[in-house]
Amino acid sequence: MGLRDWFVGLTAVVIVGGGAAACAARHSTHATIDVDAPVALADQPVHVRVSGLRAREDVTVASQAADAKGQLWRGEATFAADGDGVVDLDRSAPVSGTYGDADGMGLFWSMGPATGDPDEAWFSPGYPDAAGAFEVRLTVTVAGREIAARTLTRQWNATGVTHRTLTLDVDGVAGVLFLPSPGAVRRTGVLLLGGSEGGVGRKYDAALLASHGYPALALGYFGVPGLPETLRDIPLEYFVTAARLLRAQPGADPRGVVVNGYSRGSEAALLLAESYPDVVRGAILYAPNDTVWPGFPNGGNAWTIDGAPVPRTAIPVTHVAGPVLAIAGGKDRVWPSAAQAQRIMQRLDDAHVTAAHQALVYPDAGHGVGSFPYLAAGTSVTSPGTDVARSLGGTREADAAARSDGWPKVLAFLAA
């Protein structure tokens, strides 16, 4: 190589190197993540704002959390910073990402697992009777470089909330009882019933309700040792035992409880409001049914009362004495819960029930219309006892919007 060729090559290296340095200088090297509530209940929205960016700069904001099995979930959105170098997640719509429209909590509900279809996955952090909170890590990345990070804590249990596991041998029922801080104002207890999945579910809901001041019992009624293996021949009296136990707790209104039933649990909730109005003073029905269906998955009778099968007919409402709130999705593919919710309201009207009753129908949501918001959830489940995935209908975005709108209305219903 001659001197002239060597000089030309050196010049090219200098130019390329200088160009890379100039390119790096055009991007932000640090940013600030401002969060109004870095520690908050899991059902509470947080307001996230990223500042210190260059004007109009492309930036990716991501969320990451680990479920109870240690699997990582992630959401992300790419934005163009505004003229002041700010991205406000409440007001900024992503250019691309795991959600589409401006949504301050989009990074939370849109998270998906590292592998697999997010429509078939449900984010499940540690249960609140085992882990009182979980963490979400937010990061800001520009041109492939992480320039800011912050960890948020999402709590299930407010300060002072306690929980106790109930057993058949000791308490006559199986479940987990969550109680508000001692000395809290007496409020209506909430009895929480899951659907055909069985076991003791809805513990997240119970913990959050107790954190809002409502004694809450997540009750198992089949699929628990000592109880029926499947949803068949479940005595309504079992629920009454649980309701009486709940209303006797410190901080609970002794006049009665509200039963909150999801899917098949909504049948039991409405039957209890009709059959035991002295104990059940209201009902919240998620993705409800207005008719008694057979047992699941093997048929037979789902419910009994006084030892006799509850007839498989439309659920009567003539003795309902308390308020009823039904929440349904218009795209429910399990059953037509929106139409069924409306029929329940019509029957209450026809029966001249004077207590408040309302159906909230979210047209684009599915069977996953409830309950509390901001936890990543899929739109299909594997049916109990089978390996068959079943679509619940709706979309993740529509279900998330329904929960975000519906949960405050549930809390207002309980407070009324």
Question: What are these model-derived regions, one by one?
Answer:
Residues 353-416:
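C-terminal catalytic histidine-bearing segment of alpha/beta-hydrolase fold enzymes
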Residues 201-220:
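Short amphipathic alpha-helix adjacent to the substrate-entry channel of hydrolases
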Residues 185-195:
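Short beta-strand element of the alpha/beta-hydrolase
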Residues 281-316:
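Mobile cap/lid helix-loop segments that gate and shape the active-site cleft of serine hydrolases
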